[in-house]
Amino acid sequence: TRPDGHTPPGFNLELTRSVRDAVRTATDDRVLVVAQGSIVDTDQAEWAITDGIADAVEMTRAQLSDAELVAKLRRGEATRIRPCTLSNQRSQVRDNRNPIVSSLGDPFTGHETEDQPVEGTALHPRDVVVVGGGPAGLEAARVAALRGHSVTLYEASDRFGGMMRTAAKGPGWARMDLLADWLVGECRHLGVEL
């Protein structure tokens, strides 16, 4: 099984450092070492490379969570990268039990051949009201704004995120708060009135 939110991100980095040191000595630094093991934050990945722990970093689940991860980094938009929750809900190897490899935080991952929300595609932009600032409401507001609509999001409580905030309190689910914060941040970035 893959490590999930119960295991700290980057849990293999010290082992990787030991392997890299041994490989460097044994091969006169001719073999590259790739770090892996729940590395889902770009800051941690960059640190692993700059600190000499590894020559490269594998970030599969991070890229399932945000297929534009590399492009956003290149554009200087690291704060806009959708975080991986390490939930393992949809990111296991594709088989008959899990026919689509996807991400809990990105409903479009795994459905790349279907229509994707494209920025500014609304033929007739409208005023859209979304009631409820939980995960579904935040995502609906985000996608509507991406498509060019003017969106207002109403939430009865004093905090957006709904049940993601509750889930984040459970063992292994703390990263759900990061996803809720990202959704709120994206809504703000896209001009959604909160």
Question: Each PLM stretch: what is its role?
Answer:
Residues 1-131, 135, 139-151, 159:
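Flavin-dependent oxidoreductase catalytic cores
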